[in-house]
Swiss-Prot record:
Stated name of the protein: ATP synthase epsilon chain
Assembly notes: F-type ATPases have 2 components, CF(1) - the catalytic core - and CF(0) - the membrane proton channel. CF(1) has five subunits: alpha(3), beta(3), gamma(1), delta(1), epsilon(1). CF(0) has three main subunits: a, b and c.
HAMAP family: ATP_synth_epsil_bac
Pfam families listed in its UniProt record: ATP-synt_DE, ATP-synt_DE_N
Record carries keyword Cell membrane: yes
GO molecular function: ATP binding; proton-transporting ATP synthase activity, rotational mechanism
Disulphide bridges: none
Predominant cellular place of this UniProt entry's protein: membrane
Cellular localization per UniProt: Cell membrane
Source species of the chain: Bacillus sp. (strain PS3)
Known role: Produces ATP from ADP in the presence of a proton gradient across the membrane.
Amino acid sequence: MKTIHVSVVTPDGPVYEDDVEMVSVKAKSGELGILPGHIPLVAPLEISAARLKKGGKTQYIAVSGGFLEVRPDNVTILAQAAERAEDIDVLRAKARKSGRTPLQSQQDDIDFKRAELALKRAMNRLSVAEMK
């Protein structure tokens, strides 16, 4: 089966690099499935799981926003943060998830938005960690 090269990169460095059969991500415009030979595309990403299919198995990567760049022979995910399912510290993610009080108090709009994003990232990381 044909493959497409995938690179997942964060400001801290590369997280994943391999050839896969299919990439599935959640963009701001909706779900995208990328196969080898896909037309060029750039799309902003949601906080979600990137699914990388290879050899009948699926690997999951928690992606915290960023951009997807697609070329016919490669896909690059430029993420603000990204973690492979097996690398996620579940206890830390659960601690973040339980920190909902800043959302409830809404003391400051900026604090609320930061807390909301932290909660989304924690919930995404837990979801991806459960998929491994």
